[in-house]
């Protein structure tokens, strides 16, 4: 959308429409038909406040910039980013602010293919503060049952890494619902949707998960 979000336009967007806007934006991105925007005009329009329609929890990977892959403008999206797109108390608090206080209608946990953090967790990497961070991703590795051979459960196995990535997204969705009464209540009432997605760094496409 080329117009800048305001309070009224945000209020008119349903959770389903918010998801549709992201899907449409990704299709434009893939087709090379991004909408033209006067970014400085959007800066001016958002001086007094912001009314994003979604919050994206994504990885820090430089290949996955939410505003670009969803063809969104300034003021459209909240972004929370951490390597491996896992959920912790700070992320939950940010999501609660975005939805309960700032009116966002959609929560997206966005994983991506060839994720370095997921690969590190698959390989059991130990390095400084990275060790504790990757420990947050190990449950997704452990919950991925196939293959069972240890030699095949490494970053060298592309299908295994992809399955762990999807599993990690789904576990993050469960964490959100289980650990945030505010977000769970908003979703149950129909005020928001909470969905998972996977971005393909080779094609530019976003697959929303069931």
Regions found by a protein language model. Give the residues of each.
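Short, hydrophobic/glycine-enriched beta-strand segments
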Residues: 21-23, 54-58
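Gly/Ser/Thr-rich loops at beta-strand to alpha-helix junctions
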Residues: 61-63, 113-117
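Short beta-strand segments
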Residues: 57-59, 81, 108-112, 195-200
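Active-site cofactor/substrate anionic-group-binding motifs, chiefly glycine-
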Residues: 57-94
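Divalent-metal-activated hydrolytic enzyme cores
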Residues: 1-49, 75, 84-105, 116-210
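Short active-site oxyanion
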Residues: 53-55, 104-107
